Swiss-Prot record:
The lineage of its organism: Bacteria, Pseudomonadati, Pseudomonadota, Alphaproteobacteria, Rhodobacterales. Homodimer. Heterotetramer of two MnmE and two MnmG subunits. PROSITE patterns: GIDA_1, GIDA_2. It comes from the Bacteria. This is tRNA uridine 5-carboxymethylaminomethyl modification enzyme MnmG. NAD(+) binds at residues 269-283. The keyword NAD applies. One of its GO terms (molecular function) is flavin adenine dinucleotide binding. It comes from Cereibacter sphaeroides (strain ATCC 17029 / ATH 2.4.9). The gene is mnmG.
Length: 621
């Protein structure tokens, strides 16, 4: 029987990242997947990154993960989302060529020393003395393991729904994992059903592109990996169109034939990626919904219509799609479908992602109730690191909420659990001002260097960047200006006679940063990337101090009581999701409110402010 230090089950985004990460830590790893050719497949949308998600990809890359590098090789349109908002919430996103992404992932895995890829289906876990010892394959093969990481995606008891038709499937074209699901059921872990969906795939040759609005990528594309500077593939534009009243009427007339609305699905779907059926029902007053037509590759005529995922019958899909401008003659290559699958309550896990009830077994990805490639890959990285550290008998790595979005996600999952597919947003992070996408390497690469999971090339690149940042910060801190000097530079400040360092002046925004570059000798010679990061550091410096003070104050305020009839509706800063959960749960204290799934310190601060205002009003009567 072959034996490996770590065995990873599943070759999706979580599995690939887990296997590569554990191998970088110097342990022997086996990645078991149904088909080697399926490694790196993008099962749903052909894109990486986005709001919150792009931050996760940067954090994965900072620890030398593979997702960012693969996305840079395959990216055919890069856009920085939220570009008009503050730097902290700007998220890099890339539309990817499916083939190029798959090939990049497979090459990166093949080049990784210590990683063996095995084709097969895992059907059982070998357990002895309360610890997992290995796995059994469908062909009778046994593989020994010191640690096992399960990244099953949507395969556990997966069922594909198209209208009233249902069939077993982990995704279109692949069988589900039923025998392993039965084995996991014997562990008595809390489990549930979730669902996700995908839109029909379109033949781009039958789309009237000339009639559509086209959206190009950014002129100054922001890539994912800190080792790269520019995209590697040819860049293209996407099409934009919209649904209309006819579209909505067809969907409305056939809601009973939808798998979701026809009662065929019990699993809960992702709130922030609704199907076209959900959009028509939940947003009945909207006259149209935007649809992005995303080519799936440079040499592929398939188009992904982002925004119309569905579980309606194939003939209904064809009818409503052809009411959309530019798609009147379109041919559907593959119908959209919903997929329902098992997940396990992530509160059954330690913060290392190890299962509490069975030592040596780790869960990562959609099995933990998350949705999205990026969330899965980040969990895979965390599980791979901790499994390897455990093999080496080293201290586990606990990602903190204050240090990474990865830490926010794992803490949310393991302490609050999920009732619907969990997606990362910047609003989930109370320390988001310091958790920017551009400084992920400064936050996490030092940890990777200490752990030994970072390549020599990344070490060299990181050290060079850190030296430049330190040099730039010293120049800024060592230069100061009087109010008169600042006025001469075009920066209007109070004439209070106080000198201000150049770093402090960064808080006044982009124009001030540009003026400082002209006023500090040697600063303008630094690379643009370094000056941009220092400007963001200065911009947020005072806010971050205040943020830390608020977090400390929240800790002190946990015992404050919330009236049973407290009205959350007027709190405009709360999301509708949080308002609904608060009104349903009716927490009696701030501490109880803090434990709700999706709760954030900023939301707690809003509630506290309203409670204090109500208290002052009552005292004044």
């Amino acid at each position: 029987m072959k034996h490996f230090d770590v065995v990873v089950i599943g070759g999706g985004h979580a599995g690939c990242e887990a296997a590569a990460t554990a191998a970088r830590m110097g342990v022997q790893v086996a990645l078991i997947t149904l088909r080697k050719s399926g490694l790196g497949v993008m099962s749903c949308n052909p894109a990486i990154g986005g709001l919150g998600k792009g931050h996760l990809v940067r954090e994965i890359d900072a620890l030398d993960g593979i997702m960012g590098r693969a996305a840079d090789e395959a990216g055919i349109q890069f856009r920085l989302l939220n570009r008009k908002k503050g730097p902290a919430v700007q998220g890099p996103r890339a539309q990817a060529d499916r083939r190029l992404y798959r090939e990049a992932v497979q090459r990166l895995l093949a080049e990784q020393p210590g990683l063996t890829i095995i084709e097969g289906e895992v059907v059982d876990l070998q357990v002895n003395g309360g610890r997992v010892q290995g796995v059994s394959l469908a062909d009778g093969t046994s593989v020994g393991a010191g640690r096992v990481i399960l990244t099953s995606g949507t395969f556990l008891n997966g069922v594909i729904h198209i209208g009233d038709q249902r069939r077993p499937g982990g995704r279109m074209g692949d069988d589900p994992s039923q025998r392993l699901a039965a084995v996991l059921g014997e562990l008595s872990l809390a489990r549930g059903r979730l669902k996700t969906g995908t839109p029909p795939r379109l033949d781009g040759r039958t789309i009237r592109w000339a009639e559509l609005e086209m959206q190009p990528g950014d002129e100054d594309p922001v890539v994912f990996s800190f080792l790269n500077r520019v995209p590697k593939a040819r860049q293209i534009a996407c099409g934009i169109t919209h649904t209309n009243a006819r579209t909505h009427q067809i969907v409305r007339d056939n809601l009973s034939r939808s798998a979701m609305y026809g009662g065929h699905i019990e699993g809960v779907g992702p709130r922030y990626c609704p199907s076209i059926e959900d959009k028509i029902v939940r947003f009945a007053d909207k006259e149209e919904h935007q649809v992005f037509l995303e080519p799936e590759g440079l040499d592929d005529d398939t188009v992904y219509p982002n925004g119309i995922s569905t579980s309606l019958p194939a003939e209904v899909q064809e009818a409503y799609v052809r009411t959309i401008a530019g798609l009147e003659d379109v041919r559907i290559l593959q119908p959209g479908y919903a997929i329902e699958y098992d997940y396990f309550d992530p509160r059954e896990l330690r913060p290392t992602l190890e299962v509490k009830a069975l030592g040596g077994l780790y869960f990562a990805g959609q099995i933990n109730g998350t949705t999205g490639y990026e969330e899965a890959a980040a969990q895979g990285l965390a599980a791979g690191l901790n499994a390897a550290l455990s093999i080496r008998e080293r201290e586990p790595l606990h990602f903190s909420r204050s240090g990474s979005y990865l830490g926010v996600m794992i803490d949310d999952l393991t302490s609050r659990g999920v009732t619907e597919p969990y997606r990362m947003f910047t609003s989930r992070a109370e320390f988001r001002l310091s958790l920017r996408a551009d400084n992920a390497d400064q936050r996490l690469t030092p940890i990777g260097l200490d752990l030994g999971c970072v390549s020599d090339a990344r070490r060299e690149s990181f050290n060079k960047k850190r030296e430049l940042l330190e040099k730039g910060r010293a120049l800024l801190e060592g230069s100061s200006f009087t109010p008169s000097q600042l006025n001469e530079l075009g920066i209007q400040v109070s004439q209070d006679g106080m000198r201000r360092t150049a770093f402090a002046v960064m808080a006044f925004g982009e124009e001030a940063a540009s003026a400082v570059a002209r006023g500090v000798e040697g600063y303008g010679d630094l690379p643009e990337e370094i000056r941009q990061q220092l400007a963001k550091d200065g911009l947020y410096a005072q806010f971050i101090l205040r943020q830390e003070e608020e977090a400390a104050a929240l800790k002190r305020d946990e015992a404050i009581r919330i009236p049973a009839d407290f009205d959350y509706a007027p709190l405009s800063g709360l999301s509708s999701e949080l308002k609904a959960k608060l009104m349903r749960a009716r927490p009696s204290t701030i501490a109880q409110a803090a434990q709700l799934e999706g709760m954030t310190p900023s939301a707690l601060t809003l509630i506290l402010a309203r409670l204090r205002r109500a208290g002052r009003d009552a005292a004044a009567v």
